[in-house]
Structure formats: structure tokens, C-alpha cells
Amino acid sequence: MATSRATVVPMKMTQMKAAQVPNPGADFQIVECEIPRPDAGHVRIKVQACGVCHSDVLTKEGLWPGIQYPRVPGHEVAGIVDELGAGVSEWKKGQRVGVGWHGGHDNTCRECRRGDFRNCRNQKIAGISYDGGYQHYMVAPVEALVAIPESLSDVDAAPLLCAGITTYNALRHSGAFPGDLVAVQGIGGLGHLGIQFANKFGYKVAAIGRGSENAALAKKLGASVYIDSTSTTATAAEALQKLGGARVILATAPSSKAMSALIDGLGPNGKLMVIGATFDPIEVTPVQLISGSRTIQGWAAGTPADSQDTLRFAELTGVRPMIETYPLERAAEAYARMMSGKAQFRVVLTM
């Protein structure tokens, strides 16, 4: 993987700056470019904050097919409507809006016609299909927009538009009921939000982390129980079984080995809900699934309507991301911090 240095590329006198990836695996470039104009059905957003998500590696390293370069990453965008394209009437200039992973859909494929916009065959993704939020201004289709509640700051709202919606949406579609034992694997960028949401949903939350030093934070975030996966006394799966077996395990840390080791911690009809993305296979035997009618399901983000639900729920319950902020000009440093796994816990660019 290329190192994350940024070079400044001078261009003609223009009006905004952007942090772009010129080619797959290349260093970030801070460039000057013209402020884009919105086409019909689009709006221009004056970006106030943009989260730096692990999924940005797809753009940075060219791991998503069909990306056209240079490309500006960023799909956790919070800003203000700056200009309306032709035919846009449902949004107003000056309105606070956000754009998440779901950057648009075609409305014509089988999934869209059935209302399953999350699985649109031709889904657009901000920062992949078109330039994202690592810049002062960006253009997005109206179907990608979500209104940001006034009580949420831009830096708090931005991570909720990907990390937040992913954990919130996965949990509310997991089949768990209030009072059920729900385990959250990992206390990081996704996990620290998953613990908060699970607590507010009324679940009995077991947080699974590495090392006893994470116990206090897990309890502060809302966990009833902390399980140290490095303990030599009992495995995490055994610890869950002593609690009766988990109805749901929300797997947030991208470690297939760790996920595989937790399957035996599921109770009857238990579900391993996977949101931590990795290309390595999860190892499971048919007997593990058949015994107790266990299932494994993946979940990816959601629609702007789901984002709206996430923001409203966070507004009402006080769920907030823990963040570190960097100015746009330090995008390379912010990205490297995120990739190091040492950030506490979401990294956000500010404009």
C-alpha cells in the first residue's frame, strides 16, 4: 500500500481546494479546481465536514471496479445546500444536508422497483461513482441527500452517515428484541457506535474487545458486560454461552478469524451480523449453523431515509461518535491516522 503523503499541485486560478487521488495507490494531492455546477436533479453542497472512513481505501487503492481517476474520496459528508440544479424544489439553499455511502439509485432496476434501493443494481456511491466530500464543494443527486437536525454538529453528523447508519440499521434489522443479549465485537470506529445504539435499543450489551484496558470505556458507552477476547480463562464464545448465548453478535472489527471464533457464542436462533468488511473468508461448519438454527448475515449501510432515521435517533438518545478532526489540507495525515487503527475513533476532515 502506498504511503500517505500529500503533494500540492498548482492549477489555474480557481475557487476551491480538494484532496484527490490521481491514480490507484497514489499519494493524495491537494489541488485547486473550479467549483462545480449542479446539473438538473442535483444540488451543490458547501462541505463543512467529511468523515474519513475505512471504505475510502476502495478509492485510494483502486479496489472498486470502474473508478475513474482522478477521484475525490469521501462519503460521510455534512454541509449546506449552496446551489440548486434545474428541477430541484424539495431542498432549499442554506439547508443543512448530508450525503452518505448511498449516493444515488436508478429507480428502474428490479430492486428499486421493489423499493429495495439499498441493493440497487446501479447504485451510485459518493467518493467512488462521483467526487465526494474531501473538498470544499461537491455535487450530489437529490435522492442521496438527508436533512441534518439542527442539534447535531457537522462533525458529529458526518460519521453517523456511514458508521452510524451501518450499526444502527444492522441492529434494527437483526431480529433482536429489548432485553436480548447482543454482543458487539470490536470497540473501534463502528463498535463504539454499535455499543451505544444497542444500549439505547434496550438490549443487554456485551462488548468484546482485546485487553482489560477497554473495559471502562465499554461500560461508559453502555455495555453491561465486557469480555476480553485475549483472556486465557475462557474464550469469548464460552463467555457468551455462560450468559445464555447471544441473540445477535454485531461483528464490527474486520477480522474474519475473530468473527469465526464467535459463532459458537450464539444462542438458539442466534445471528452473526457482519458489518466489518474484509476480503478474508469466515470459517464455519454446517454443523455450527444447523445446531441451534444459527445464521450469518451481512449488512451494508442503508438509504438516505435510513440515514434520516439514524440522525433522528441519535439526536433523541444522545448517541454521538468519538472523533478526531483534521483540516482538509492534512487529508493524507488524517487518512493515515484512520488506517493505523489508533484513532479514537472516527476521523473527520473540517473545511
Where do the PLM segments sit?
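Glycine-rich beta-strand-centered segment in the early N-terminal region that forms part
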Residues: 34-50, 63-110, 144-152
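Short N-terminal strand-loop motif that marks the start
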Residues: 1-78, 140, 350
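NAD(P)H dinucleotide-binding glycine-rich loop of Rossmann-like/cofactor-binding domains
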Residues: 104-185, 220
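C-terminal hydrophobic helical "lid"/dimerization subdomain
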Residues: 2-14, 200, 260, 304-351
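Adenosine-nucleotide cofactor-binding segment
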Residues: 181-187, 199-261
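Hydrophobic/small residue at the entry helix of a nucleotide-binding pocket
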Residues: 166, 190, 214
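Glycine-rich phosphate-binding loop and adjacent beta-alpha segment
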Residues: 203, 253-325, 351
